[in-house]
Amino acid sequence: MKTKNILKSVVGCVVASAALASCNVDPEFYTQVTPETFYTSQEAVYQRYARPFTHWRWYAGHNENLWRLQELGTDEFMLPTRGSDWFDGGNYQKLHHHEYTDDMTCISEGWKLSQMGTALAWDALEDLEEVNFDKLGFPEGTRESMLTQLQSLVSYFYLKGLDLFGGMPLYTTTRSDIQPRATDEQTFAFIDSLLTVSLKGLPVKQELGAKETGSINAAAAATMKAQLYFNAKSYIRKEMWSECAAICQDIIDGKYGKYALDPDWTNIFGFNNETSPEIIWSVPSENAKLETDGMHWSDMVPYNYRNYLGSVENSGSNNAVGLMPSLDPTGKPYTSKLGRVYSKFNDKDIRKQNYVYLGDGKYRGMFIVGKLQNPLNPEWVCLGSREYKGQIINEVDQVAYFTRVKNDLYKKADGSYMYNSVADLPSTIATAEENSGVRVTKVSPRPTQEDKKLMFNPDVPIIRLAEVYYMLAECKMRLGDKAGAATLINTVRKRYFENGNDPNPVTAANLDKYRMLDEWQQEFVAEARRRTDLVRWDAYVTEDWWDHKATNNTNFNRFPIHYSVLEANQKLKQNPGYGRD
């Protein structure tokens, strides 16, 4: 019988079978059956192989914590206190103001889930290495494909950990003793080496528009390698624009498989997006099977929004996040260079419409804004539940206590009104109402009740070809070729305008730091990457935006390690700038 040293979680969490590779306890030994006696069928092998991918699916496509770490605290999204809703101990206000502490749950999850992912992948790989694939009748190359994909999955989790926290404890087996944190450079090199090996064994997509299933192919690994080089300045203080550009050009040229920009943006996120030629890697989702909406639906939309879609079932909403406002309470535009997300979309951009499901899996618009009365079925309305209870909600690109103006419930001690006009209203992360902020319904759109069987059919894109175009564009810009950068960005932008007539294309003359950041934002809004882009441009801690003053503390470019993680593995060191007195 084989014995395996199953290491407990660094955060003390949990599940004995998770095989986490960071802990501060003596190894515990469990008796386990050998692969030869347990993995006696192809089904059993596939189940073992799939376990780390189910964790990846949760981490990347369903759990809200990774999304919140990447989007809240940036100039893109807010999770404001809405009256009595969403204060939650002030945690979301802390994220907004970069007041990070080592006891925040989302930060704990960011570390824990990435470490768990690497452990699960190595554990599965070790088991499958001992399986006789030929004896079980697998097609030639199946073993190599599975093992290489699991190694690539390890790279993904370490890349996320490096991005959020810096150097990580590095493991190549679940049988290892607990490790301290490696340096940033060591972690970077380790990820790079894993991806270099993976690229030699991963399958290359042969058919344009072939169905994506969540498996890792060569283009996904190549893009991860490009992402690593693209952010090398942030990770290891070394510029690698030329190296990143070379990989991006190879991906676009088809070296790693057949992909193409999708001319219809709704195909990328829509109800049959597994066949979009732009998708390189995505989290699968399907009605009544592996369902996920990436938390985008429930957290993004207002209360009762399901009624705007004909009372579509299984569509409760939390009325949480919204875009940073573009307008102050009086309607005057803010002037900060960053933020103001909705207002920066050109009015002729076909995405800048209220979301309307048209039927048969078709829809228009990416936003939830204005009076929420369905234009195709006017009796379908979204009514308020808090300040605007019983009224049709009007989502505004502002944040303020509008219902408190000259309201008898809000008076000072001398009997005068607390707010005599909208000009008196504060606009902060702590002073929102239920209709504050434009919402984005981009990832995992919903049908109406009539087409309820399409619900959850959209996959959650993780990597798409447009990102490769934008990485190459920024690399060209950084290397002095602004005209080449503009051409690449405009190649993507044209699909958002009728007949490709872009009224404000990128040019060599108008492309600067802020235009580049705006282009990243408009193309990838809500796709859990904004923090990384701001850090790469040295803007995350140095720029102001709505209700946020720059800290100018570069330590905050990384999150602290949760105190429970440090207690569980005392070989780990806290990131600079954090700690307890």
Where are these regions (language model features)?
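An aromatic- and glycine-enriched ligand-binding surface/loop that stacks and positions planar moieties
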Residues: 24-87, 199, 219-410
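Long, intrinsically disordered, low-complexity segments
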Residues: 21-25, 29, 78, 86-88, ...
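Sec-dependent bacterial lipoprotein signal peptides
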Residues: 1-21
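Conserved, well-structured interaction surfaces
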Residues: 39-50, 54-60, 83-165, 178-189, ...
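Short coil/turn linking the two alpha-helices of tandem helical-hairpin repeats
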Residues: 160-164, 169, 231-237, 480
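C-terminal substrate/ligand-recognition segments
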Residues: 104-108, 358, 362-490
